[in-house]
C-alpha cells in the first residue's frame, strides 16, 4: 500500500494556511470597501433626490421658493450633514426607529393615511408623500423598498382612484397622492431610464438634426409665425387663392414630416417593448384590473386612464424634456425642436386614444394617416400582463442579502410625519386601518423629541428624501443582512434623508441635518468571517439533517463572528460551499435561505454583539458607522435566522432538508477528491469515498443534544464563557462546536477558533483542502481547530495567546471541565478512535457500508472527532438529531438502519464493543485533547478482556453519561484510561444536560456510544492495543490526575492539534525517507522502526534552534512531548487523521472563495449603482443650470434682440466673431452679478457659460451658419449631391482610398457614421468640433481593434475618415467648415486642432474625387 508522506502532508498544510490567511485578509478589505461604497451610495442618492426635488420646485417656480432660494438650497444640499439620530432625539430614537420601521412595513396603512390626509385637506400631505418615498423607502434603491412602494401604489389605486367620482380627472390633475408617488418612482427607476433612453434617443436626435422649421399643422397658427413681409414672400398676397394654396401646401408638408417623425417614435416604442420596466407594467395592470371592477367606469374609460398613466405621466414628459431624463446630454434643444417634440407627444397621446370618442376634430385628418392600432398595440402589451398580487422582483438581485437598516430623515420631516399621522388618526377617515395606526402612535413619546438648537424648523415645505436602505449583502448571494442597529446602518438612511434638507429656507446658512435613525433590524454578520469550524459544522448539519433549526445555525454564525471581523464568514455561504462540491445547488439553496434569514436576525445579533462589545473585538470600531449603516454583514450568517424563526427559519429548514441529502451526496464527492493527496486511511488517493466517511462523522458532531434549546445553550455558553481564558483545546472545541448556542457563540468569541488557529490552521486547511481534495477535513484538524477556535472565541485577544493556549495541554485539559457544555460537540467528534469515529453515528448502522471506501480503516478517532465537531456546529441539527439527524444523515448514506442504530448500537455491541462505545463517548470529549489517546484507548478497549471493563462498557451510555462529573479511578488501569475519558466526558455532558436538557446529554451519549460501538467492531484489537500501550505515566499530568480513558482521548486530540500546527508551519527540508510497512493504507503499528513524526519534529526543532525562534521551539518541543507517548501505529493514525481532516476542509476553502466572489460582485454592483446615481445627479444639476440660464436670458431679452439686429448688419467674418465674443462676455458678467448665481460653484458657472453660449448661438445660428444665405445653401447642396454619387461607386477597397487591407474587417464603420450624422443637431462651433472629435476617436478605436499589433497612423486614419464621410454624407459640410473656422478657429489647440486638420483635409480630398472615374 502507499504510505502517507509526512512531507507531502506538511507541504499541503502550509499551502492551506498561507492561502486561507491571504483570502481572509482580502475578504476583510473587501468587506470594508463594500461598507464604504454602500455608505457613499446612499448618501449620494439622498442628495441627488433632494436636488431633483429642488429642480422641480425651480421649474414650477412656485411662490414658496424663488429661483434664488432654489439655487442657495442646491448649494446647501451638497454640504448635507448626516448625524446619528440619537444626537437629536436622545433615548427617544429607539421609539421613533420602531415607529418608522413598522410604518414602512405596512404599505396599506401608509396608503390609507395619505388618502385620509387628502380628504382632510392636510397642508403637508405632499410633503409627507415626499418623505415616504425618500426616507421610509430610501429612494427605492433596495429591491425590498421598491416592493413596498409598489404595494403602496396598489393600495392608493384601491383607496383613492377607485373611490373617486372622476378618477381620470384626478389622475390628469397630477396632484393626488398616487400621481405624485408614481412620478417620484418612475423618475428614479433605473429600468425606466433604460427603456426611455433605448426608445427615445435615436428618434429625438433625428428630430434635432432636422429642426429647420416648426412642424405646425394649424393653418392659422402657421401664418402667425411669419412677419407680413415673410408671409408675402412665401405665400404671395394675403387673401388670394394662391396664398391659401401655398399655406395648405406648407401644412401638408409639415403633416407629412410629422407623420414620418411620429412613425419613427412608434417604431422604436414597439422595438423596445421588451425592456419596458416590469414594476411599471405591474402598476398599470393593477390599475386596469382594479378599476375594471368598478361598475360606473366603462372599459374605455379605464383604458384611457392607463393611457394617461403611461403616456402623459411617463413617456411624453421624457419626449418633451429629454435633457431632464438624461436621454439627450450635449445636444441643446432650441425652441423649434421643443415645439416639434411637443407635437410628437400630442400625436402619440391622441393615437393611443383612437377608438374612443375623444380627439380634436381638426387633427382627425392627421391621425387618418397613421395605423390606427400602432400605439394601442403597445398599450395592450403593457396592460395585458397577468395582474399578479405580489410586485415583480428581479430574477437577478445583485443586492440580495443587503437590507436597509436605517432611515434618513430630517428633524422637521420626522415631526411633520408624526403630526400628520396624529391628525389623520383624529380625523376619523381611516376605517379599518385606524387600529394599526393607533398602535403605532401609542409607542411614540407624547412630547416632541428634543432637538439641538442648531436645527431650526425650516419653513421649506419641500419634502426631504432620506434613503433608508442599507446594503446588507448586496447581491452577493452572501446572505449578509446589513440590517443592524448600528449607527452605520443609519448612514444608509442618511443618504435618503438628504432630501429633507431641501426643505430648508434660503435664509439658512447651514443645511438642516439629516438624522440617521436605526430601524432596529438587521444582523451584524460579516461575510467570509465564519470560522472554519462553523463552516464545516454548518455544512455537516445542513447535509446531515434537514430539520436543524435555523436558529441554531444563526447562533453558530454569531459565535464565529464575535471573534473576528477579519474573517468575514457567511454562514449561508458556508453552507452553500459545503454542498458546493458535488451538488452545488444544495449549497446555493441553503445559502439563499440563510440570506433570507439573516435579515431578521440582525437585530438580535446586533443587540448581542453590542451587549458583549463584540463589535470592538471584531475590529469594527474604526468604521463602525459605515458598517452599521450598511450593515454589510449580510444575513449571510445563519445566525440571523435565530432571531426570526418564522420565514427565514422555514426557508433555512427547507434548504437544510433539501441540502441535507444533496449535501451529504456532495460531501461524499467532495471537490478536490481528485486531488493527489493520498488518503491516509486507505493509502489510495483521497477520493470522494472518503468524504462519505467524513460525512458520517459529521453526524456525530451533531450528536449534541438535539433537544437543547437555544436559550439553554446560551446559558451554557455564558456559564462556559469563563473558559474563554482557558487554553483547553477541548473547551475551545466545545465552544466552537456549540456555536449553535447563541449565547455561546457571542460570548466565547465567535470565531475564536477560526480566528486564532484558524488564521494559521484554517489557512493551511484551506490550502491543503484544495490540494487534498478534502473539503471538510472536519476530523481532528478541524476539530482541533474548532476547539482551538472555540477557545480563541473565548479569548479573542490575540492569536498568539490562543495558539499558546492550544499548546498547553494542562490548560486545555482543565478548560475542558469548564467547557462541559461543549463536550457535546466533542462527542460528535470522537474521531480519535480511528475505526470507531467513522462509525460514530453512521458507523453503527451503516458504517461498514460507508466506510468500505476507506478500507478496513475507519476514520481515526481524531477524524471522527473532528467530523463530529463540525457536525456539532450544526448543533441545531443535533438537537433534533438524536434520531432525526442520524436518520437524515444516514439516509444520504442509504443506510436505513442508521436511525435506530443509536439506541440499539450500544446494546447490540458486545461487552468490548460497549466499552468501545463508552470510550468513544469520552473520546469525543478528549478527542481534542489527544487523538492518540483516543486511538490507543480504542485499541486497549478492543484488547480488554477484564470483566470490570466490560461491565463498565456494557453499562448503558446514558448512564455512563450521568456518572459523576469527577473522574472515577477504575480498578483496572487500562480501563481507567479509557473509561475515565468516557466518564469525564459523560460528566461534562451531565452538567451540560442539567443546565440545558437531559435529552441533549442523552443524545450526545448515544452518539458517542454508537460511534464507539461501531468503531470497536471495526478495530477491536488495535484499539485495545493502543490503550494498553499507553500507560498512565504517558498521559499528560492533567490527564493522569483524571481518568486514563479520558486522558488518552484528550492526548490524542491534543497531539493532533499541536502536530497540525507544527506541520503547517514547517518548511520542507532534506529528510531521509523512512520505510514503513502499511496495512490498508495505515502504518503497521507493529513496525519497530523509529517514529517518523518524531524524526520530522527533531529536524524542525533543529531549524528553530538555528533561527533562534523561541516560540516555535517551545511549540515544537511540546508537540514532540505529546507525540512521543504514542507508538508508531498510533502516530500513523494521527497523520492519517490529520490528512483526512485536511481533505475534509475543502468546503471551508470553497466558502472563502465564494465569500470573496460574492463580495467582489457586490462591490462591483454597488460601484455601478453609485455611477448611475452620480450620473442622475449630474443630469439634474446641469438641467438646473439650464433652467437658471433661461431665467437669466429672459430678463435680458431686450439686449439679445438688439444684439441680433446688430449682428445682421455686419458682413465681415472677423467683426461677427468679435461681436459674438463681446456679447457673451457681457452676459457672463450679468450672470455673475445676478442674485441667482451668488452661490454657484465654479463648475456650475462653467456649465452656465456653456448654456449661455448655446442659447445665444441658437438665436443667431442661421445668420452665422449661412452668412451668404442662399449662396451657401446651394453650395452645400452641390457638395452633398456629389458625395451622394460617390457613395454609390466608392467601396472600402477602392483604389483611390488605399485603405490597408488589415482594417477592412470593420468596414463600413457604422458607429463612426452615426456620430458624424448628428453634427447638425449641434448649433455651437464648440459642440460641432466635439462631434467631429468623437467620430475620429471612434475610427481610431476601431482601427486599433482591427490591428492590435501596431498603432494606426495618419496614413491609416485619413483614408478611413474619407470613406466614413462619403458614406455618412452629413449635410452642409462646407458651411460647417466655414462656421467653425470663423467662430472657433482661435480656440482650437492640441488634440482638437489635430483632428480638425484631418477633417478639413478629408473634405478637401472628397471635393477632388471624380465620381465619373
From Swiss-Prot:
Q: Name one GO biological process term.
A: regulation of protein transport
UniProt keyword annotations, A-Z: Endocytosis, Endosome, GTPase activation, Guanine-nucleotide releasing factor, Membrane, Phosphoprotein
**Biased composition, Polar residues: where in the chain?**
451-467, 737-756
Q: Which organism is it from?
A: Bos taurus (Bovine)
Give the protein name, as stated in the record: GTPase-activating protein and VPS9 domain-containing protein 1
Q: Which Gene3D superfamilies match?
A: 1.10.246.120, GTPase Activation - p120gap, domain 1 (1.10.506.10), VPS9 domain (1.20.1050.80)
Explain the purpose of this protein: Acts both as a GTPase-activating protein (GAP) and a guanine nucleotide exchange factor (GEF), and participates in various processes such as endocytosis, insulin receptor internalization or LC2A4/GLUT4 trafficking. Acts as a GEF for the Ras-related protein RAB31 by exchanging bound GDP for free GTP, leading to regulate LC2A4/GLUT4 trafficking. In the absence of insulin, it maintains RAB31 in an active state and promotes a futile cycle between LC2A4/GLUT4 storage vesicles and early endosomes, retaining LC2A4/GLUT4 inside the cells.
Q: Where in the cell is it found?
A: Membrane; Endosome
Chain's gene name? GAPVD1
